[in-house]
């Protein structure tokens, strides 16, 4: 698996994002549409949005992140508060190296749910890739504090902190 790709949650390490159980959908009064399927009372638009989301996840799982990002962007436009859709969109954007966009998607989740460790992790990785290791370290530290047993969280934090340390040493050694 390449360093910039999204893999399965259980197989990711270092600077990779991956799938997790998506119990964060906010479409139907707090219940997860993933477990129960589409609500029979939902409109055709919501059914279409759910189909876009499921197809986007399928494409993402098969390594077609660019196609997934297109579908997931449409789903997100229809359901802008859905954290499940935003997470999948952020993963697709990260995999297609659209790190600013990925950071934006993960930031929306973090703003709505600061205790979402995976969103903190995704935001941290995306910020690291945009060249902001200071902000990245903050979010990765939060993720690692929330889930210290997840090695890829602590590995990513260690990597970003090493980058910050190296930059600080260079600044100290470089005469102005």
Report residues per predicted region.
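Long, contiguous interaction/recruitment modules in multidomain scaffold/adaptor proteins
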Residues: 1-51, 176
């Amino acid at each position: 698996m390449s360093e910039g790709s999204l893999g399965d949650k259980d197989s990711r390490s270092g600077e990779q994002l991956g799938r997790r159980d998506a119990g964060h959908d906010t479409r139907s009064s707090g219940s997860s549409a993933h477990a129960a399927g589409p609500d029979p009372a939902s409109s055709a638009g919501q059914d279409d949005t759910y189909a876009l989301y499921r197809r986007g996840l399928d494409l993402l799982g098969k390594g077609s992140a660019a196609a997934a990002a297109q579908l997931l962007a449409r789903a997100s436009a229809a359901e802008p508060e859905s954290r499940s859709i935003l997470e999948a969109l952020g993963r697709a954007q990260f995999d297609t190296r659209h790190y600013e966009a990925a950071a934006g998607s993960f930031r929306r989740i973090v703003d709505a749910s600061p205790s979402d460790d995976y969103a903190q992790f995704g935001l941290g990785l995306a910020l690291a890739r945009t060249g902001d290791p200071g902000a990245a370290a903050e979010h990765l530290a939060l993720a690692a504090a929330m889930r210290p047993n997840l090695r890829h969280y602590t590995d990513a934090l260690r990597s970003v902190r090493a980058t910050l340390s190296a930059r600080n040493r260079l600044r100290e050694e470089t005469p102005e």
